[in-house]
Amino acid sequence: AEEIWEYASRTLTQSAASVAATVAGSTITAIRGDTLSAALENIGALTNYSKLWFTVKADEADTDATAQVQIELAGGLLYINGAAATTAANGSITINDESTGDVTILLKAPETAKLSPGSYYYDIQIQSSTGILVSTLTSGMFVVAADVTRATS
């Protein structure tokens, strides 16, 4: 069997847009109108929790109901661009490793298309299974880059 690097040709199996929607340090960058799939690793153990949220806001003092994005582990996409989401399945949080706290945030293209280019704040919070303790596991900047092509059909 040949080693992969010995093949006559190789095919990129991930789009450049998927690669661009990345996490660098504590900054998540998404391209407006593209599906965001961002892997965050080692954010802290995800055990004994009842809720987990990923929230993006223009100002940290904004209410959750006016968030640019809010996704809840069990509930999916709750808010988009300051309004209640109409399709909860367009956003999700997947726990990849509970012990280290590896998660993947997914926000589908129809939802990122609703976001204005700019810099925002994000965090991931967890509520303990007792319902009392809420902790911020990680936070940083969420950048929405403008898309060049706006055609959808």
Segments (PLM) and residue ranges:
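Fibrous stalk/shaft segments of extracellular and virion attachment machinery
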Residues: A1-A20
